[in-house]
Protein backbone atom coordinates (compact mmCIF):
# COMPACT_ATOMS: atom_id res chain seq x y z
CA UNK A 1 0.00 0.00 0.00
CA UNK A 2 0.97 3.64 -0.34
CA UNK A 3 0.93 3.96 3.44
CA UNK A 4 3.36 1.05 3.82
CA UNK A 5 5.65 2.48 1.12
CA UNK A 6 5.74 5.83 2.90
CA UNK A 7 6.54 4.11 6.18
CA UNK A 8 9.43 2.21 4.58
CA UNK A 9 10.79 5.41 3.01
CA UNK A 10 10.63 7.14 6.40
CA UNK A 11 12.46 4.27 8.12
CA UNK A 12 15.14 4.30 5.42
CA UNK A 13 15.53 8.08 5.80
CA UNK A 14 15.92 7.70 9.58
CA UNK A 15 18.61 5.06 9.12
CA UNK A 16 20.52 7.24 6.63
CA UNK A 17 20.27 10.21 8.98
CA UNK A 18 21.58 8.19 11.92
CA UNK A 19 24.50 6.94 9.83
CA UNK A 20 25.40 10.45 8.68
CA UNK A 21 25.25 11.89 12.19
CA UNK A 22 27.36 9.04 13.52
CA UNK A 23 29.97 9.64 10.82
CA UNK A 24 30.09 13.36 11.57
CA UNK A 25 30.50 12.71 15.29
CA UNK A 26 33.23 10.15 14.65
CA UNK A 27 35.14 12.62 12.48
CA UNK A 28 34.77 15.41 15.02
CA UNK A 29 36.42 13.44 17.81
CA UNK A 30 39.11 11.64 15.84
CA UNK A 31 42.66 12.87 15.49
CA UNK A 32 45.09 11.93 12.76
CA UNK A 33 46.23 8.98 14.82
CA UNK A 34 42.73 7.56 14.93
CA UNK A 35 42.25 8.30 18.62
CA UNK A 36 40.02 10.79 20.38
CA UNK A 37 41.91 14.00 21.09
CA UNK A 38 42.93 14.72 24.66
CA UNK A 39 45.65 16.80 26.25
CA UNK A 40 46.93 15.75 29.65
CA UNK A 41 50.64 16.56 29.57
CA UNK A 42 53.11 19.33 28.77
CA UNK A 43 56.88 19.67 28.95
CA UNK A 44 58.83 21.49 31.64
CA UNK A 45 62.05 23.40 30.88
CA UNK A 46 64.28 24.07 33.90
CA UNK A 47 66.05 27.17 32.57
CA UNK A 48 69.44 25.66 33.40
CA UNK A 49 70.39 23.22 30.66
CA UNK A 50 67.25 21.45 29.39
CA UNK A 51 66.10 21.69 25.78
CA UNK A 52 64.87 19.76 22.72
CA UNK A 53 66.77 19.29 19.48
CA UNK A 54 66.02 17.80 16.08
CA UNK A 55 68.34 15.11 14.74
CA UNK A 56 68.73 16.85 11.37
CA UNK A 57 68.61 20.38 10.00
CA UNK A 58 65.15 21.96 9.92
CA UNK A 59 64.84 23.12 6.30
CA UNK A 60 61.07 23.24 5.81
CA UNK A 61 60.93 27.04 6.13
CA UNK A 62 63.84 27.74 3.78
CA UNK A 63 62.75 30.06 0.97
CA UNK A 64 59.20 30.52 2.28
CA UNK A 65 57.79 34.01 2.75
CA UNK A 66 55.03 33.10 5.22
CA UNK A 67 54.94 31.21 8.48
CA UNK A 68 52.80 30.90 11.60
CA UNK A 69 53.95 29.51 14.94
CA UNK A 70 51.50 28.56 17.67
CA UNK A 71 52.16 27.21 21.15
CA UNK A 72 50.96 27.30 24.71
CA UNK A 73 53.56 28.73 27.10
CA UNK A 74 53.92 29.23 30.82
CA UNK A 75 56.72 31.80 31.16
CA UNK A 76 58.98 31.32 34.16
CA UNK A 77 61.18 33.87 35.89
CA UNK A 78 63.88 34.49 33.30
CA UNK A 79 66.41 37.28 33.23
CA UNK A 80 68.68 38.28 30.37
CA UNK A 81 68.11 36.39 27.10
CA UNK A 82 66.29 33.06 26.79
CA UNK A 83 65.35 31.20 23.62
CA UNK A 84 61.93 29.66 23.14
CA UNK A 85 62.80 28.28 19.69
CA UNK A 86 65.48 28.76 17.06
CA UNK A 87 66.92 27.47 13.82
CA UNK A 88 70.40 28.93 14.00
CA UNK A 89 73.89 27.49 13.45
CA UNK A 90 76.33 28.15 16.27
CA UNK A 91 77.72 31.64 15.80
CA UNK A 92 75.79 32.22 12.57
CA UNK A 93 72.64 33.84 11.30
CA UNK A 94 69.28 32.26 11.89
CA UNK A 95 66.41 31.07 9.70
CA UNK A 96 64.12 32.26 12.49
CA UNK A 97 64.30 32.69 16.23
CA UNK A 98 61.92 33.37 19.13
CA UNK A 99 63.44 34.69 22.32
CA UNK A 100 62.67 36.65 25.43
CA UNK A 101 64.73 39.36 27.06
CA UNK A 102 64.47 40.51 30.64
CA UNK A 103 66.49 42.36 33.21
CA UNK A 104 67.33 40.95 36.61
CA UNK A 105 64.37 39.90 38.71
CA UNK A 106 62.15 42.75 37.61
CA UNK A 107 58.94 41.74 35.86
CA UNK A 108 58.64 45.24 34.40
CA UNK A 109 61.26 44.58 31.72
CA UNK A 110 60.40 41.46 29.78
CA UNK A 111 60.05 41.39 26.01
CA UNK A 112 59.24 38.88 23.29
CA UNK A 113 61.34 39.08 20.13
CA UNK A 114 61.18 37.39 16.73
CA UNK A 115 64.25 37.44 14.48
CA UNK A 116 64.98 36.48 10.88
CA UNK A 117 68.53 36.23 9.52
CA UNK A 118 70.93 38.40 11.56
CA UNK A 119 70.68 40.18 14.90
CA UNK A 120 70.17 43.59 13.34
CA UNK A 121 67.31 45.76 14.57
CA UNK A 122 66.28 45.80 10.90
CA UNK A 123 65.41 42.10 11.09
CA UNK A 124 63.37 41.78 14.24
CA UNK A 125 60.05 42.55 15.91
CA UNK A 126 59.63 43.01 19.65
CA UNK A 127 56.91 43.64 22.21
CA UNK A 128 56.90 43.99 25.99
CA UNK A 129 55.02 41.13 27.64
CA UNK A 130 56.06 42.02 31.18
CA UNK A 131 52.61 41.32 32.60
CA UNK A 132 52.78 37.59 31.95
CA UNK A 133 56.29 36.71 33.11
CA UNK A 134 56.20 34.24 35.98
CA UNK A 135 52.47 34.76 36.55
CA UNK A 136 51.90 31.01 36.91
CA UNK A 137 49.40 30.92 34.06
CA UNK A 138 49.29 29.31 30.63
CA UNK A 139 49.19 31.71 27.69
CA UNK A 140 48.59 31.00 24.03
CA UNK A 141 51.21 32.53 21.74
CA UNK A 142 50.91 32.96 17.98
CA UNK A 143 53.53 34.56 15.77
CA UNK A 144 52.25 35.24 12.25
CA UNK A 145 54.71 36.23 9.53
CA UNK A 146 54.37 37.45 5.96
CA UNK A 147 57.69 38.81 4.73
CA UNK A 148 56.04 40.22 1.60
CA UNK A 149 53.98 42.65 3.69
CA UNK A 150 54.85 46.33 3.82
CA UNK A 151 57.56 47.51 6.20
CA UNK A 152 56.41 47.28 9.81
CA UNK A 153 53.57 44.87 9.03
CA UNK A 154 55.58 41.71 8.37
CA UNK A 155 54.95 40.19 11.81
CA UNK A 156 52.06 40.09 14.25
CA UNK A 157 52.05 38.60 17.74
CA UNK A 158 48.92 37.27 19.44
CA UNK A 159 48.73 36.45 23.13
CA UNK A 160 45.55 34.69 24.24
CA UNK A 161 44.11 35.56 20.80
CA UNK A 162 44.64 39.31 21.25
CA UNK A 163 46.84 41.13 18.70
CA UNK A 164 49.91 42.72 20.33
CA UNK A 165 51.11 44.92 17.43
CA UNK A 166 54.86 44.51 17.95
CA UNK A 167 57.30 47.08 16.65
CA UNK A 168 59.95 46.35 14.07
CA UNK A 169 60.74 45.45 10.49
CA UNK A 170 62.34 42.59 8.56
CA UNK A 171 64.39 43.26 5.46
CA UNK A 172 64.41 39.67 4.20
CA UNK A 173 61.59 38.77 1.82
CA UNK A 174 62.00 35.02 2.40
CA UNK A 175 63.28 32.89 5.26
CA UNK A 176 66.99 32.28 4.63
CA UNK A 177 68.62 28.88 4.63
CA UNK A 178 70.90 28.71 7.67
CA UNK A 179 71.30 24.95 8.15
CA UNK A 180 70.71 23.95 11.75
CA UNK A 181 68.40 21.69 13.75
CA UNK A 182 65.29 23.15 15.32
CA UNK A 183 65.87 23.81 19.01
CA UNK A 184 63.13 24.40 21.56
CA UNK A 185 64.21 25.91 24.86
CA UNK A 186 67.72 26.87 23.76
CA UNK A 187 69.68 28.89 21.24
CA UNK A 188 73.24 29.93 22.07
CA UNK A 189 75.28 30.01 25.26
CA UNK A 190 73.68 30.11 28.69
CA UNK A 191 70.29 31.09 27.34
CA UNK A 192 67.88 28.34 28.36
CA UNK A 193 64.13 28.85 28.52
CA UNK A 194 62.48 28.49 31.91
CA UNK A 195 58.83 27.49 32.04
CA UNK A 196 56.53 25.02 30.32
CA UNK A 197 55.55 24.52 26.67
CA UNK A 198 52.65 22.64 25.11
CA UNK A 199 51.37 22.05 21.55
CA UNK A 200 54.17 23.67 19.55
CA UNK A 201 53.15 23.93 15.88
CA UNK A 202 54.55 25.53 12.72
CA UNK A 203 52.61 26.31 9.55
CA UNK A 204 55.10 26.97 6.74
CA UNK A 205 53.69 29.00 3.85
CA UNK A 206 50.70 30.32 5.81
CA UNK A 207 50.10 33.62 7.60
CA UNK A 208 47.13 32.90 9.87
CA UNK A 209 46.75 36.33 11.45
CA UNK A 210 43.10 36.66 10.37
CA UNK A 211 41.21 36.96 13.65
CA UNK A 212 38.79 34.14 12.85
CA UNK A 213 41.70 31.76 12.30
CA UNK A 214 43.43 32.92 15.47
CA UNK A 215 40.20 32.29 17.37
CA UNK A 216 39.87 28.83 15.83
CA UNK A 217 43.40 27.81 16.83
CA UNK A 218 42.93 29.26 20.33
CA UNK A 219 39.68 27.38 20.71
CA UNK A 220 38.10 27.52 24.16
CA UNK A 221 41.32 28.35 25.97
CA UNK A 222 42.77 24.86 26.03
CA UNK A 223 44.67 22.66 23.58
CA UNK A 224 42.92 22.00 20.27
CA UNK A 225 43.28 19.21 17.71
CA UNK A 226 45.29 21.22 15.19
CA UNK A 227 45.03 18.52 12.53
CA UNK A 228 41.24 18.71 12.38
CA UNK A 229 40.27 22.38 12.50
CA UNK A 230 37.34 23.61 10.43
CA UNK A 231 38.98 26.28 8.27
CA UNK A 232 42.69 26.05 9.16
CA UNK A 233 44.78 23.39 7.46
CA UNK A 234 46.95 21.01 9.46
CA UNK A 235 50.35 22.38 10.52
CA UNK A 236 53.56 21.53 8.72
CA UNK A 237 55.12 20.45 11.99
CA UNK A 238 53.34 19.76 15.29
CA UNK A 239 54.79 18.65 18.61
CA UNK A 240 52.29 17.61 21.28
CA UNK A 241 55.16 17.94 23.77
CA UNK A 242 54.07 15.80 26.75
CA UNK A 243 51.30 13.86 25.05
CA UNK A 244 52.57 11.24 22.57
CA UNK A 245 56.09 11.48 24.04
CA UNK A 246 58.22 8.35 24.29
CA UNK A 247 60.21 8.08 27.53
CA UNK A 248 63.09 5.65 28.02
CA UNK A 249 64.81 6.31 31.33
CA UNK A 250 65.33 10.07 31.22
CA UNK A 251 65.49 10.25 27.43
CA UNK A 252 62.40 11.88 25.93
CA UNK A 253 61.42 11.77 22.27
CA UNK A 254 58.79 14.21 21.03
CA UNK A 255 57.32 12.95 17.73
CA UNK A 256 56.10 15.19 14.93
CA UNK A 257 52.37 14.54 14.60
CA UNK A 258 52.31 15.58 10.94
CA UNK A 259 55.69 14.82 9.41
CA UNK A 260 58.78 12.93 10.52
CA UNK A 261 60.84 15.67 12.17
CA UNK A 262 61.12 14.38 15.74
CA UNK A 263 62.81 16.05 18.70
CA UNK A 264 64.89 14.49 21.46
CA UNK A 265 65.64 15.85 24.91
CA UNK A 266 68.92 17.11 26.28
CA UNK A 267 69.48 17.33 30.06
CA UNK A 268 65.85 16.53 30.85
CA UNK A 269 64.39 13.93 33.20
CA UNK A 270 61.28 11.80 32.80
CA UNK A 271 59.42 13.98 35.32
CA UNK A 272 59.68 16.94 32.94
CA UNK A 273 56.75 15.35 31.11
CA UNK A 274 54.21 16.78 33.52
CA UNK A 275 50.46 16.73 34.04
CA UNK A 276 50.04 20.48 33.75
CA UNK A 277 48.12 21.72 30.73
CA UNK A 278 46.27 24.82 29.50
CA UNK A 279 42.62 25.25 30.38
Question: Which role fits each region the language model picked out?
Answer:
Residues 1-49, 214-279:
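Extracytoplasmic low-complexity segments
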Residues 44-67, 124-132, 186-189, 219-230:
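Short surface loop/edge beta-strand patches of beta-sandwich-type extracellular domains
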Residues 48-113, 148-154, 191, 206-213:
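Extracellular glycan-recognition modules
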Residues 71, 136-147, 157, 201:
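Short tryptophan-centered beta-strand motifs in secreted/extracellular beta-sheet-rich domains
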Residues 86-95, 154-164, 220-225:
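Short edge-strand/loop segments of extracellular domains
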Residues 114-140:
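Short, aromatic/His-centered strand-loop micro-motif at the edge of beta-sheets
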Residues 159-181, 225-226:
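Short, solvent-exposed beta-strand-to-loop segments that form ligand-recognition rims
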Residues 177-198, 207, 220-226:
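Extracellular glycan-interaction patches encoded by glycine-rich segments
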